[in-house]
Structure formats: structure tokens, C-alpha cells
């Protein structure tokens, strides 16, 4: 979803062009209904050599003028090279992934190699060089009317259609990125005391979310939407929320694409990597401690090497997060 500015800005600069997106099966579903794309071609991430050959032949027929390669991976470069072997040879724009800059910051704490751009802005750089004005890096998604109506029906079923609520994403792809579950429990209590409700979001089977569901099973103000919506239906739900509080995960980006302010909790990762929230009302909350071990990972994968386990997340107080969250609720009782 962070790539959506590319399609919009390409369309504005080249209104008569035909835009085709090649993406992995599953990941690209979030881009359905995008009015700037003429076609989405899905491929399996674990395709065989014959599958890849067939894909290249399918792409070659279209005779592209431009390849905008945001992956800059071995596979994407191989596909691009194959397409450039035959006339007409398309122009090839390649993204600088800043992998070395991230590794230098992780290993040595060197931040001087980052240019201050978000990842969204970084992906726009090849196009920006052809445009005098600054391109917009705001993301966008397009749930269908049916998606929105389905979510509205769920909200009505739970008497949430006219209530203020905050969505909570307590899980993450890796444990290091998770704010302590006890802190989430305390935060939810504060939200309920303020008069608002809470909707738990995420995938089905996530341990942290399931623990919160069990803990608040008798509450009339905590609801779980984990695993019951498609990706675009989830986007529609987040659009209807007052705010989102989540770990450094795709939930934050999903909400912001729908213009819902988010509070993102960062621990092993840092804003210099380019994935900080973008909206003016959104907030990135991180530890106030000067930890030499931080950042420790590009994605949050791995084990904590600090003797005070996950101090980067445990040192983020519930009060600090609540102080940010309550500003996004109407007439909140502090």
C-alpha cells in the first residue's frame, strides 16, 4: 500500500499511458479498485522456472515503454533484463533500496547516510527527477461500496455505528516489535473509562489479540474484528475509527491510507528506516532512553541482545500512549 503514490503520480504525469502492475499473489489484493491502474498481473512468489518464463513472455507481448522497478531484487532485475533484450527496449527505472544505510545504522549507529526521506518518497525518486514540483507521497486505498456496507452492517450489529472507537493492533510479525500486552490492557481500560469503545484488529490466531479478547470477554465496549474482514474491508473499518494504536505494522499504514490518524509504537526499528506515520495528527511513540542497541533489526526479526529484555518497548509507558490517543477522541475525560 505504500507504493500507491507511484500509480497516482504516474497517472497525473502521463494521463494517456496504460499502467500495468506486476505483484505477488495475495499482496496485491490491497490495490484492487485502484482507478490509476489499468491492469494488475499476479504471480506466485515461489514460481518455477517455467512459470517465470511464461510470465516474461506474457509481459513481453505488451511492449512496455517503461519499467518502474521498486523491488530491485534478483527476480525483478532478471525480469527487467529479459524484457530489455528485445525491441522495443523499455526504459528501466530502478529504486535505491537503502539497504546499506540501514545495515550501517544497525551495526554501528551511523545515521548520516539517511537522506530524511520516507520510503514512500524514496520510491518516487525516479519519477521526481522528471518533475519540477514536489510529488505527493500520500497513500490511498479504494474499498468498494460493498466493502464499506459490509463493515457498516457489522458496526450496527455491535451498536458501534454512532460511537467513538479506537482500533488496537496488538500483534506484529515478530515478537520484538510487540508492546507488552499488559500495557495494551491498561490502555484499553483508559479508553473505556473515557467513554469510547475498542475494536481489536489483526489476523486470526494472533496470540496477543486472543489474550485481549479473553481478558475483556465480559466487557460491553471491546470488540474483535480480527480475521473476519478482507484487507480492503479492514481498510474501510479503519477509516470509520477515530484513531488506531498499533505496533510498527501494516495496520498503521492501512489506517493512514484511509486518512485515519495512527499512533505507531516503535522499538527495534526507527523512523530513519522510512516507515514512520505520515499524517499530521499521527504520532510515532518510542522510548526516551538512549539505547546503543537500537535499532537492532531491519524488520524486528531476531532476539533481543539487551540484558534488559525488550527495554525499548517496555520503557514506553501506557500514560504516554494514552496522552496521544485521547487527543484523537472527542471530549475525552482525562
Predicted regions mapped to residue ranges:
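Catalytic machinery of carbohydrate-active enzymes
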Residues: 1-334
